């Protein structure tokens, strides 16, 4: 990052800390990750604003606060192998890849997946596996996972994702249609314990259809 971007990223991390993000590792990674790399050049001047922005194909790059909050929730269990549903721009994947040993990420829109792969390569992040597929189905032959993060809102919690959680694993997922809640689900044997975190607004998690 150039000096201006570095300062802007540090200021964003400070803003997120003021907004309630407490995990120092998450804040440090936000402060050194060039968010402008994940946006069209025309939106680059907005890269370090705490707002969601369009990335094409009807999708968005999530608000930095939500990226940090979901990452913080996921890291509470100290996961090593993580599944991300909805690669999108690749920004959330870039944050996660710097904090976990192995990241697997699934995207249903081929053009977005190609761009995200190129961006993570530019950042020299090589602990990421990419799949073009239906996020509702997860990535069964790569599981089980210590944690799963879903970056689009599901109408209900996908059963396939619950089954791909390791015992003690954590699923962080927005659930709902018009009204959405961020949920944290923990697997304990065959039992699943869910906790509502806060109200959120995400694009929908599309079931089955690839683009």
UniProtKB/Swiss-Prot annotation:
Pfam families: PCMT. Keywords: Cytoplasm, Methyltransferase, S-adenosyl-L-methionine, Transferase. GO terms for biological process: methylation; protein modification process; protein repair. Its EC number is 2.1.1.77. It catalyses: [protein]-L-isoaspartate + S-adenosyl-L-methionine = [protein]-L-isoaspartate alpha-methyl ester + S-adenosyl-L-homocysteine. It is found in: Cytoplasm. InterPro entries: PCMT, SAM-dependent_MTases_sf. The active site is at residue 62. GO terms for cellular component: cytoplasm. One of its GO terms (molecular function) is protein-L-isoaspartate (D-aspartate) O-methyltransferase activity. Belongs to the methyltransferase superfamily. L-isoaspartyl/D-aspartyl protein methyltransferase family. Catalyzes the methyl esterification of L-isoaspartyl residues in peptides and proteins that result from spontaneous decomposition of normal L-aspartyl and L-asparaginyl residues. It plays a role in the repair and/or degradation of damaged proteins. This is Protein-L-isoaspartate O-methyltransferase. It comes from Shewanella loihica (strain ATCC BAA-1088 / PV-4). The lineage of its organism: Bacteria, Pseudomonadati, Pseudomonadota, Gammaproteobacteria, Alteromonadales. The gene is pcm.
